[in-house]
Amino acid sequence: MVATCLQVVGFVTSFVGWIGVIVTTSTNDWVVTCGYTIPTCRKLDELGSKGLWADCVMATGLYHCKPLVDILILPGYVQACRALMIAASVLGLPAILLLLTVLPCIRMGQEPGVAKYRRAQLAGVLLILLALCALVATIWFPVCAHRETTIVSFGYSLYAGWIGAVLCLVGGCVILCCAGDAQAFGENRFYYTAGSSSPTHAKSAHV
């Protein structure tokens, strides 16, 4: 029963974390920047935001973004962080699909528990790789951006990325280390048989 609960917890945690990583990858509010001194920017109400795909300016209620489409002039760290976040987002899809197939409520014929166990282990490894890619990108980007411009604060995209990466790391570790062995993945299968002298149904465990 404990192993079953941990499998579900690992799946839910990983799924929420993966969504956070996708949000981080697709949005541009990674860091809030200032082209002048911070007091001047606050007085002029002019702040910017920098992300993987665009540089944006917020001034007097207006929000304008300039897409970063010229790959040849982009800093190397931006291109590397793009690659890492895209890889993290892509790795999440097979990991979540594999976890779906090993949930206790999912049955794929009469497969042995060891097959589910191997898929769960593969999903756990993918989730940890996902988390590492996201963590490297979301730490590397603000460090390098700080060398180019003044950073006022971190944006919601970075926070979503950090939370998502940590959740995926926790989910992957739970699946790998705490969700049981091959027997635990095979013991939660049930079938129902009709009683010979009673209209009620008895539940029998099938290991």
From Swiss-Prot:
GO terms for cellular component: axon; basal part of cell; bicellular tight junction; cell junction; lipid droplet; neurofilament; plasma membrane; tight junction. The chain crosses the membrane at residues 2-22, 83-103, 123-143, 158-178. The modification Phosphoserine is found at S197, S198. GO terms for biological process: axon ensheathment; bicellular tight junction assembly; calcium-independent cell-cell adhesion via plasma membrane cell-adhesion molecules; cell adhesion; spermatogenesis; tight junction assembly. Keywords: Cell junction, Cell membrane, Leukodystrophy, Membrane, Phosphoprotein, Tight junction, Transmembrane, Transmembrane helix. Belongs to the claudin family. Plays a major role in tight junction-specific obliteration of the intercellular space, through calcium-independent cell-adhesion activity. PANTHER family: CLAUDIN. Interacts with tetraspanin-3/TSPAN3. Interacts with OCLN. This is Claudin-11. It comes from Homo sapiens (Human). The gene is CLDN11.
